[in-house]
Amino acid sequence: MTNSNRIKLTWISFLSYALTGALVIVTGMVMGNIADYFQLPVSSMSNTFTFLNAGILISIFLNAWLMEIIPLKTQLRFGFILMVLAVAGLMFSHSLALFSAAMFVLGLVSGITMSIGTFLITQLYEGRQRGSRLLFTDSFFSMAGMIFPMVAAFLLARSIEWYWVYACIGLVYLAIFILTFGCEFPALGKHAQHSQAPVVKEKWGIGVLFLAVAALCYILGQLGFISWVPEYAKGLGMSLNDAGALVSDFWMSYMFGMWAFSFILRFFDLQRILTVLAGMAAVLMYLFITGTQAHMPWFILTLGFFSSAIYTSIITLGSQQTKVASPKLVNFILTCGTIGTMLTFVVTGPIVAHSGPQAALLTANGLYAVVFVMCFALGFVSRHRQHSAPATH
């Protein structure tokens, strides 16, 4: 593979994470405007965004098999057509049913693109370099989560219709579409060149189960925590601006953490540093929940920084449980993480209704403790050392 081809594929991976980050995180910015557009209360409008999450979940799950049937380049180009149709549907329709369908299609497109992006990184890079590259790729999710809410605020403040925000997000996919030209993708399944030697199917091992549970608990814990931090802070008497600043601080330090750990991870055994980070994150979250108001900003800043590498490290370790990176295995762990996203309000909503926001934060803290236990247990069964040893950089 030529170096220019590798760079193009890497940028497709970066932009695939930016696309999903933009679609997921911009929701809160435009929800009120969309509710006004359809003349509905915000509470009922928020339910339609479940179609976006459902599309992401279904596509990540199915793409483990689709990757071996439909070439990756074909998927990305067809995804561009679907993206154009979905954005056009948002622009020219006043039907709530069509809005929900367009959101579902956007979810499908971003889920397929992100699973391809993740797989490309696991194919292009090996050993410790894979972890650092995947972490840098994941930082584009957070970067888009910072940039596109600002774009949305800029457009909405000038009374420009909300659907132009999605047109701007579509430009990210336009860049992916352009990059597919003159670019060779890894062939999979029936499209791959088969050698004379039969391909030995590798067993995943119990370590994959530990990582899948860790992925689900981490995402459910993280989103359950950050979703209720503003309500918890307001309950302590903090202003709305101060409560919002806590969330901004978390994501800002999370992004800086990703950049820092994309360099740091190269020098450590991934399972050991993951266990340390998971343990630190659980302790820091507990200190945030039980600490004083004066210390809360510092605890959430350090929590964001030290927890930033956890999810990507889980995916990287998963890809290293087999000698050859398996798209089905990577997508299985991604699917478990996405299930955590879907369950966020299903799990935390009733807890808040019954016991208040602090109970939801403590539940999230318990889930982080489960992540630590899973990562610790993985140390006894992980195969990543024997598979990545020859490829370590």
Curated annotation (Swiss-Prot):
Alphabetical list of NCBIfam families matching this protein: PRK03699.1
Domain of life: Bacteria
Annotated TM spans: 11-31, 51-71, 78-98, 101-121, 134-154, 162-182, 206-226, 245-265, 273-293, 298-318, 332-352, 361-381
Annotated gene: tsgA
Keyword Cell membrane: yes
Family note: Belongs to the major facilitator superfamily. TsgA family.
Cellular component GO terms, alphabetical: plasma membrane
Protein name as catalogued: Protein TsgA
Pfam families noted in UniProt: MFS_1 (PF07690)
Topological type in the membrane: Multi-pass membrane protein
Species whose genome carries this gene: Salmonella newport (strain SL254)
Record has Hydrolase as a keyword: no
SUPFAM superfamilies: MFS general substrate transporter
PROSITE patterns from the UniProt entry: MFS
Subcellular location: Cell inner membrane
Keywords: Cell inner membrane, Cell membrane, Membrane, Transmembrane, Transmembrane helix
Molecular-function GO term, any one: transmembrane transporter activity
PANTHER family to which the protein is assigned, alphabetical: L-FUCOSE-PROTON SYMPORTER (PTHR43702), PROTEIN TSGA (PTHR43702:SF3)
Gene3D superfamilies found in the cross-reference section: MFS general substrate transporter like domains
